[in-house]
């Protein structure tokens, strides 16, 4: 009888402890529950089975495999234009390295200037100079072992002046995206832009002549209305068709085999079903991404939403054997917008890694990328600003990875 009473008391005590832990929403301690062992079909031998490109170079295969595995334990930290965008135009090392002493694990670049109508590929041309700088940065990053990712703020096909719909007429907005589809009035124009992209990617080479892998995320943030490829200006099927055409043209027509392709809407989707509304298919996507600024600038409710969306993303990626990533995020500090206390080390870190529901569905976000710093504002604090220690603490946590704790991403494990 005493044993029975003792067992009941012990059981009640355990329930109370678990209830107290699960309701402690304000705790800033790191989650100490280790993720369960993942039953993942991905191996070093079958990696091509789950990739877009069955002819991907061995370095590109290794990047896919290592990114997928990295997300099980750590999240690589990076920044757009990290080598050239500095707060207060300080120059020198990246602001990440100024703060932490280490290079970023991810470098973001863009094809915008590379495909600009004014790029005449002459050495005295400003746009061509930007192309050369970007190529140089990508090569330097690869030589260090940094992951390279590209977005593409492609200017509209009529005047090629802007990628924002705010700068376009109603007629341009309603026809621009459809015009680049096969059979459209601007499909040849679009193919020429892709020719330029293919030429640059095909000439990204390491010291031994090997092709440098990149992650490419065309038509990003498509669920918004600020870009001319946004959801208001094309149907889901038209979006899929354009994405598929882009991949097929680069991979099959141009023979480019050093790309991982990323699908990256903004933060409007909270269910897998909605997230996949414009998904072009597993044969066309390697990375399931999401850009999310809004939720991470909206207080505790926003952090909870962001965490739930990354969990949704992780589940979708696990099901499809794809890579999950927070492809853009950040909170910009300016003269009129002060830092948020512990935004990096507590709020963002818990968004990336927390599992307060104890449902054994853990986030597996392989990388997070902050937007670029400028003269007048920053997303990543350098070593001199008031929240520098907050970022450094974030970067030094057990599930964060700068370059110093990144595995060899371009070599398959033995």
Predicted feature residues:
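Boundary/entry segment of secreted carbohydrate-active catalytic domains
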Residues: 35-113
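Alpha-helical scaffolding within the catalytic cores
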Residues: 62, 88-96, 132-135, 199-200, ...
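Substrate-binding cleft of extracellular glycoside hydrolase catalytic domains
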Residues: 116-252, 256
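Bacterial Sec-dependent N-terminal signal peptides
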Residues: 18-44
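Glycoside hydrolase catalytic-domain groove-lining segments
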Residues: 278-336
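Aromatic-lined carbohydrate-recognition surfaces of secreted/lumenal glycan-active proteins
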Residues: 77-80, 213, 217-219, 243-273, ...
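Sec-dependent bacterial lipoprotein signal peptides
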Residues: 1-19
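Substrate-binding cleft of secreted/luminal carbohydrate-active enzymes
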Residues: 75-80, 322-414
């Amino acid at each position: 009888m005493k044993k029975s009473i003792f067992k009941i008391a012990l059981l009640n005590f355990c329930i109370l402890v678990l209830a107290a832990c699960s309701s402690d929403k304000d705790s800033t301690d790191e989650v100490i529950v280790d993720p369960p062992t993942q039953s993942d079909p991905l191996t070093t031998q079958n990696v091509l089975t789950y990739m877009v490109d069955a002819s991907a170079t061995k370095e590109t295969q290794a990047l896919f495999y290592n990114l997928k595995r990295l997300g099980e334990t750590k999240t690589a930290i990076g920044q757009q234009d990290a080598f050239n965008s500095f707060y207060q135009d300080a120059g020198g090392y990246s602001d990440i390295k100024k703060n932490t002493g280490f290079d970023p694990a991810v470098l973001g670049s863009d094809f915008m200037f590379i495909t600009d109508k004014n790029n005449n590929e002459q050495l005295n041309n400003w746009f061509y100079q930007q192309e050369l700088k970007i190529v140089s940065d990508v090569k330097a990053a690869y030589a260090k072992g940094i992951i390279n990712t590209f977005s593409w703020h492609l200017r509209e096909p009529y005047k090629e002046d802007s990628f924002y719909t705010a700068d376009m007429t109603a007629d341009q907005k309603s026809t621009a995206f459809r015009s680049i589809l096969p059979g459209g009035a601007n499909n040849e124009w679009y193919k020429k832009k892709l020719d330029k992209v293919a030429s640059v990617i095909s000439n990204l080479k390491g010291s031994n002549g090997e092709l440098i892998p990149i992650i490419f995320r065309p038509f990003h943030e498509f669920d918004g209305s600020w870009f001319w490829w946004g959801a208001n200006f094309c149907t889901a099927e038209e979006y899929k068709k354009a994405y598929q055409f882009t991949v097929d043209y680069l991979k099959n027509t141009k023979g480019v085999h050093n790309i991982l392709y990323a699908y990256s809407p903004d933060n409007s989707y909270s269910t897998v079903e909605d997230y996949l509304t414009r998904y072009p298919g597993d044969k066309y996507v390697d990375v399931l991404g999401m850009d999310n600024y809004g939720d991470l600038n909206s207080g505790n409710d926003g952090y909870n939403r962001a965490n739930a969306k990354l969990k949704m993303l992780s589940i979708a990626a696990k099901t499809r054997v794809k890579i999950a990533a927070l492809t853009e995020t950040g909170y910009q500090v300016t003269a009129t917008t002060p830092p948020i206390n512990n935004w990096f080390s507590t709020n963002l870190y818990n968004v990336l890694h927390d599992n307060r529901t104890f449902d054994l569905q853990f986030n597996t976000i392989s990388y997070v990328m902050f937007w670029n710093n400028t003269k007048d504002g920053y997303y990543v604090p350098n070593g001199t600003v008031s929240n520098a220690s907050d970022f450094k603490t974030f970067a030094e946590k057990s599930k964060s990875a700068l370059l110093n704790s990144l595995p060899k991403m371009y070599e398959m494990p033995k």
